[in-house]
Regions:
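Flexible "cap/lid" loop of the alpha/beta hydrolase fold
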Residues: 23, 27, 34-62
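Short beta-strand immediately N-terminal to the catalytic nucleophile in serine-hydrolase-like folds
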Residues: 12-14, 39, 130
Length: 182
């Protein structure tokens, strides 16, 4: 796609599963990635991610989208945000429910099997790793693990935030833009 658009080099931001994909872009096509931001993601499954995603897969096989929706929200957002969202779980889950969960199952399985640990050190571009110390989906140590294996990395951990750090941290966008600008 980048070739078709005549993009020779890019600043890449990958969040959650998008961060897993962005890792492989930077590993396999280093000439295309000038700078990389990896937010609330991991380089290999850990106990937290395995437990959470395996539970979602069980719920998907039972076709229980409402419970997937609720569990995802409860594990993604801070209590402050959840107070706003909880009254709307029922209607939001109905509005966002897919026709079937096949794609969800494929994506969740991809997250469970993603393991770039042996290759992550091949990332050569400047990389900004961002996480939250209360991430209940990929775990709080996943960002540190990523940063420890990428030579030119900078690490930022937000206290009190979790998997929604990219949404709830007031300075997330400015931090990312500042990294890309420098």
């Amino acid at each position: 796609v980048m070739n078709q658009l005549n993009i020779t080099k890019a600043f890449v931001l990958g969040v959650s599963q998008g961060g897993m994909i962005a890792q492989y872009l930077a590993i396999d096509y280093p000439e295309l990635v000038e700078k990389l931001v990896l937010a609330v993601t991991l380089c290999q499954p850990n106990e937290t991610s395995k437990s959470v995603i395996s539970n979602w897969l069980l719920l998907a096989k039972e076709k229980d989208f409402k419970q997937i929706f609720i569990d995802t929200a409860e594990k993604t957002y801070t209590e402050r945000k959840l107070k706003t969202y909880r009254p709307f779980y029922s209607i939001l889950s109905k509005l966002t429910e897919p026709k079937n969960l096949d794609r969800f199952i494929i994506q969740a399985t991809a997250c469970l099997t993603h393991n770039a640990l042996d290759e992550i050190s091949k990332i050569q571009c400047p990389t900004f790793v961002i996480g939250g110390d209360n991430d209940k989906i990929v775990g709080s140590s996943s960002s540190c693990e990523l940063a420890n294996h990428i030579a030119q990395s900078k690490l930022k951990i937000y206290n009190g935030l979790g998997h929604s750090t990219y949404e709830e941290a007031k300075d997330f966008n400015s931090q990312v833009l500042s990294f890309f600008d420098n």
